[in-house]
């Protein structure tokens, strides 16, 4: 089964996979090479999740702007 790139996964799927990886790493039964691969995958998932959260915060901030007559601003994603 091919592993999806974290940036192409939903936030929920990313967190679920990250949670599973943490459980496997905490168990301590993995060979060093396997543990390192899972750790690298976990870092990629965590970074992608953080980017999605930052993007969501930016969108919420724009939507909840205090002033009704505030100028519209362009939304830019982190991927740009």
From Swiss-Prot:
UniProt subcellular location: Cytoplasm
SUPFAM superfamilies given in the database record: XseB-like
One Gene Ontology term from the biological process aspect of the record: DNA catabolic process
InterPro entries per record: Exonuc_VII_S, Exonuc_VII_ssu_sf
Record's keyword terms, sorted: Cytoplasm, Exonuclease, Hydrolase, Nuclease
The keyword Hydrolase is annotated on this UniProt entry: yes
Single annotated GO MF: exodeoxyribonuclease VII activity
Main location: cytoplasm
Endoplasmic reticulum found in the keyword field: no
Family of this protein: Belongs to the XseB family.
Subunit-level organization: Heterooligomer composed of large and small subunits.
The protein's name: Exodeoxyribonuclease 7 small subunit
Species in which this protein is naturally found: Vibrio vulnificus (strain YJ016)
Lineage: Bacteria, Pseudomonadati, Pseudomonadota, Gammaproteobacteria, Vibrionales
């Amino acid at each position: 089964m091919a592993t999806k790139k974290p940036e192409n996964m939903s936030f929920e799927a990313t967190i679920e996979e990250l949670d599973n990886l943490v459980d496997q790493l905490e168990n301590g039964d993995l060979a060093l090479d396997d543990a390192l691969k899972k750790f690298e995958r976990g870092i990629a998932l965590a970074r992608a999740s953080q980017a999605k959260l930052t993007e969501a915060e930016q969108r919420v901030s724009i939507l909840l702007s205090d002033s009704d007559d505030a100028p519209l601003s362009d939304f830019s994603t982190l991927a740009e």
